[in-house]
Amino acid sequence: MAMNNILGLFAHSPLKPLQKHSEKVTECSDLLIPFFQTTFSKNWEQAEEKRLEISQCEREADSLKREIRLKLPRGLFLPIDRTDLLELVTQQDKLANYAKDIAGRMIGRQFGIPEEMQEEFLHYVKRSLDAIHQAHRVIEEMDKLLETGFKGRELKLVNDMIQELDSIEDDTDQMQIKLRKMLYTIESRYNPIDVMFLYKIIEWVGVLADQAQRVGSRIELMLARS
């Protein structure tokens, strides 16, 4: 995005660039669904195309992050500290990085999720992405929160949304346990290194939900300080 466009967003609302970045990060993460679907069919050429899409999207998110860091005006009349806003951008940018890393590691190993685990695994990925979408919804709601001076019913709504984000992350924890148990019952069929790789993939997908929760926690901390 051009520098003057970023400045224009800041002029309209100091939170708009943050929301734009969150939107891009969410877009990157969502690309994991078609990526994993191509790995299920062992179509590694098509999976590589999807990985490149994720990588390009991550670069765009990174560019937005850098522009925000460089152009976030000082002396904003906000009940939020500038440093807190920059830290929030850093935390949500990690989501795009993790999506890129997951796809890259899958392509590097070219070893897919066992067929009997694929349906449950895809549910798990989608639930982890639900956490990212919930974090994005909280970011989108912050404009209204700004209008109310970070208080009242809007503050309660945002806090409730963050609690829902925590609940989604709890769901992914339980789904991760279930997937590990499924893998344990079939791991004797596979090379031990491949088995360890599968356990790591399950863990990495869970990190997406964990990181989305960290974004929510960062917002919660910002609100407590405001």
Swiss-Prot record:
InterPro entries: DUF47 (IPR002727), PhoU-like_sf (IPR038078), Put_Phosphate_transp_reg (IPR018445)
Pfam families named among the record's database cross-references: PhoU_div
Cross-referenced NCBIfam families: TIGR00153 family protein
UniProt similarity note: Belongs to the UPF0111 family.
Protein name: UPF0111 protein HI_1603
